[in-house]
UniProtKB/Swiss-Prot annotation:
Any one annotated GO CC term: membrane
Organism: Meleagrid herpesvirus 1 (strain H2) (MeHV-1)
Name this protein carries in UniProt: Envelope protein UL45 homolog
Intravirion side: 1-47
Main location: virion
Cellular location(s): Virion membrane
Keyword Transmembrane helix found: yes
Keywords, comma-separated and alphabetical: Glycoprotein, Membrane, Signal-anchor, Transmembrane, Transmembrane helix, Viral envelope protein, Virion
Length: 212
């Protein structure tokens, strides 16, 4: 004889799963870790914000310098060996007993040009106070400005003289830029804000102004 089945048993649903017991200590640890995580997130956000702000400021300064800063006002670099630095130019005696064409070719090999009158005047006046004997002033050197008029250095300063067939060659070129000035100049040239030969022309103008 079968036992009767209660009506409530037919409505039962089988439920399978795991029962996990959690003590109150776990909830306490989770509450303690939450403020630490929040504080770390705030610190990380502040650090990223500071780094981004510094980057933006540096970029703004560099971009502003491309348009406003005159790199000619910065400290210039040093002249190469065997070159004399004077003002915004570097000069050197590149040869002797050279004709006009030989003088031009000699300076071209040194990536330079013949000295002009303004720089020749500054050079002679700079070495005159050292009391070099007149014998050292016997050389006549050519000028870029004229093919017929040369310069003869004297204790009293430069004196114009007729150019002989051959004479001394003195070359000049702009003084090298410092590292920072070179970066600014290259950036301006790359952005087509300035011509590549602008510095050479500007240095020549400043040298002429200094000699007056």
């Amino acid at each position: 004889m079968m036992s009767p089945t209660p009506e409530d048993d037919r409505d039962l649903v089988v439920v399978r799963g795991r029962l996990r017991m959690m003590d109150s200590g776990t909830e306490t640890d989770r509450e303690q870790r939450h403020p630490r995580t929040t504080w770390r997130s705030i610190c990380c956000g502040c650090t990223i914000g500071m780094v981004f702000t510094i980057f933006v400021l540096v970029a703004a300064v560099l971009l502003g310098s491309l348009f406003t800063v005159s790199y000619m006002a910065m400290e210039s670099g040093t002249c190469p060996d065997e070159w004399i630095g004077l003002g915004y130019s570097c000069m050197r005696v590149a040869g002797k007993n050279a004709t006009d064409l030989e003088a031009l070719d000699t300076c071209a090999r040194h990536n330079s040009k013949l000295i002009d009158f303004a720089n020749a005047k500054v050079l002679v006046e700079a070495i005159a106070p050292f009391g070099v004997p007149n014998a050292a002033y016997g050389e006549v050197f050519r000028l870029r400005d004229s093919k017929t008029t040369c310069i003869r250095p004297t204790m009293g300063g430069p004196v114009s003289a007729d150019c002989p067939v051959t004479c001394t060659v003195i070359c000049q070129r702009p003084r090298p830029l410092s590292t920072m000035s070179s970066i600014i100049r290259d950036a301006r040239v790359y952005l087509h804000l300035e011509r590549r030969d602008y510095y050479e022309v500007y240095a020549s103008v400043l040298s002429n102004a200094m000699s007056k």
